[in-house]
Amino acid sequence: NKHNLTHDEAKDKVYPILRAEEGKLHWYCLDYWQKIFELDIAQLKEDVSHLIQIHPFVLEFLDQAKAHNKRIYLVTNAHRKTIQLKMRVTNLEDYFDDIITSHDYGVAKEDQGFWHKLDESINLDKAKSVFFDDSAHVLKSAKKFGIGTVVAISKPSSKIKTKTIEGFINIETFEQAIPVKPH
């Protein structure tokens, strides 16, 4: 315990700091939290990298999208270091035409500025675009920008209960998004 705090003292100190940044770019920035808490956050993520898993039916979904010549972008608020770790563990990188993090644009996906910069960068066909996310705020932002199909992932982790996000199509796994079911 680097700061000699009890668990409850640490929670009382950390939670208000975290809540103040929720939904902002800093919320997702490893460098920011490393500076604030004087901890090697990237190493802490590395230490739990064995918990990183590919969601059920993601590979089948991506295979079908590729087979139909769809452009596929991973668009995330995660810090570039976090994405590099996840790609190293999952080997998913080759499925994507590009991996874009909100840090590339200096604004989180919750903000309309992100979507405008994304559109400038990859020339979105908004009406034909499909976007998946597990954050209600991000989904609302994508919908407001005009993304044609916005889908809520209601079970983003096997470790948490299903949570329905009102106002959106909800899926628990990508099996529900595969147009032709694998045999």
Question: Language model features by range: what are they?
Answer:
Residues 20, 45-48, 70, 105, ...:
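A general structural-boundary detector
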Residues 63, 79-80, 84-183:
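Asp-based, Mg2+/Mn2+-dependent phosphohydrolase catalytic module
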Residues 1-60, 68, 79-81:
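N-terminal helical cap/lid subdomain that shapes the substrate entry/recognition surface
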Residues 66-73:
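Short, conserved structural micro-motifs that define repeat-unit consensus positions
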Residues 5-7, 39-41, 72, 94, ...:
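Residue-level detector of short coil/turn "hinge" positions at structural boundaries
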